A protein has these predicted regions:
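Flanking helices and flexible, charged tails adjoining ferredoxin-like Fe-S electron-transfer domains
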Residues: 4, 32, 40-141
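Ferredoxin-type iron-sulfur electron-transfer modules and their immediate structural context
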Residues: 1-26, 30-36, 40-42, 46
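Short, highly charged, low-complexity non-transmembrane loops/tails of multi-pass membrane proteins
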Residues: 102, 301-306, 357-363
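Long, contiguous internal "core" modules enriched in hydrophobic/ aromatic residues
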Residues: 135-139, 143-149, 157-160, 193, ...
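Juxtamembrane/interface segments at transmembrane-helix termini
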Residues: 178-181, 287-297, 351-360
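N-terminal signal-anchor module of multipass membrane proteins
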Residues: 110-111, 115-158, 164, 168, ...
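Membrane helical hairpin/interfacial module
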Residues: 159-205, 209
């Protein structure tokens, strides 16, 4: 896949992709890759793949060296039935139709690949719809999201020292996610087009503001500034996943989910009455479980997500609910333990956000 509007290139925070103007090939620059794996989420066709051995993503470059030398790519030359062909395409027509009745919406990235094949029936659910498989939990990303949002909540509650501690822990989690952590500095290079770069910049601004608020007497201006950058962190985090096109990761839902996480954190840390914290937690729980209403739908991404949450991932859902209930029960008597349990429950919930995501894939 070498798209007219490649999502891998647009999402990459490290500027590790480039698109050749002559051939249209989307080329991955191994030396620039930091191994965040975000392009594996933004690409709906699962073309970039993460190499555990190398700590970076690898991708077909359409044998760019062969093309520039006037030769066909290796796959074209090797195919014994001549089932693959490279040809000049009309960029304006890219993504309008690609010959597949199923699979991701081509309008997302305008792929220039065209399939000539017998169309599968579209009036029946596929095997993937009936028996979806859980995805990767991305524990470091889950930690980054939860800890950063709890840090924002702690800052809003007037607890800058706790906010600083949580923000530093979130930053460590973000680096732990990288395949090449020594190149973490490259994560800000794509700020013009990558929401991941913008999240890094927002969190980098929030952390010192939280530190300054913790160390100075006149905290109000710093708290306001920390609150503004904290809101930017939450917004950027939601946009990172919303742009992947997954229906369960739509922007309104993620803003509600991430924002309610920060709200529950603020209420819990501020020591407000248990009824207030519980009401906010239940509202957040409604956002988490809203997808369950699609459990009886025959096919589709949200139907698969509902089946995963009620089936293979039901034990994790149970643990998440148990930690929430116990955390609320002990919050008033032992605030530190209650907060720790609530954070633990949110970590499970955020892992489910990744594991239960079941986007449309290639048939």
């Amino acid at each position: 896949h070498h798209c007219a509007d490649p999502a891998c290139l647009a999402g990459c925070p490290a500027e590790a992709y480039e698109k050749d103007a002559l051939t249209g090939a989307v080329i991955h620059l191994d030396d620039a890759c930091i191994g965040c794996g975000y392009c594996t989420m933004t690409c709906p066709y699962e073309v970039p793949s993460f190499s555990d051995r190398l700590g970076i993503v690898r991708k077909c470059d359409l044998c760019h060296g062969r093309l520039t030398a006037g030769e066909a790519p290796a796959c074209v030359q090797a195919c014994p039935t001549e089932a693959i062909r490279i040809q000049v395409v009309d960029i304006d027509a890219a993504g309008t139709s690609w010959g597949l009745a199923a699979g991701p919406d081509p309008a997302l990235t305008r792929p220039t690949t065209t399939y000539t094949t017998t169309r599968p029936p579209v009036d029946r659910p596929s095997a993937a719809d009936l028996r979806p498989q859980p995805g990767h939990g991305h524990p470091a990303l889950a930690g980054l999201l939860v800890l950063s949002q709890w840090a924002v909540g702690a800052a809003a509650a007037g607890r800058p020292a706790l906010a600083l501690t949580l923000a530093l822990a979130a930053s460590l989690a973000s680096v732990a996610h990288l395949g090449r952590p020594l190149l973490a500095w490259r994560a800000v290079l794509g700020w013009r087009h990558s929401w991941l770069s913008r999240e890094v910049l927002a969190l980098s601004a929030f952390t010192p503001l939280a530190a300054a608020a913790a160390l100075t007497a006149d905290r109000l201006p710093l708290r306001v500034a920390a609150g503004a950058t904290g809101a930017a962190v939450v917004g950027c985090s939601a946009a990172i996943y919303a742009v992947t096109g997954r229906r369960w990761w739509r922007l309104p839902r993620l803003l509600a989910l991430f924002g309610s996480t920060a709200a529950v954190a603020a209420l819990a840390v501020a020591g407000l009455p248990l009824a207030v914290v519980a009401a906010a937690a239940l509202a957040k729980l409604a956002v988490e479980g809203g997808v369950i209403r699609h459990r009886s739908t025959a096919r589709g991404e949200r139907a698969r997500t509902a089946r995963l949450l009620l089936g293979p991932l039901s034990a994790q859902v149970g643990r998440r609910l148990a930690l929430l209930a116990i955390g609320l029960a002990v919050l008033a008597a032992v605030p530190a333990a209650g907060i720790a349990l609530l954070i633990g429950g949110d970590l499970i919930e955020r892992g489910l956000l990744f594991r239960a995501a079941s986007p449309d894939k290639m048939p």
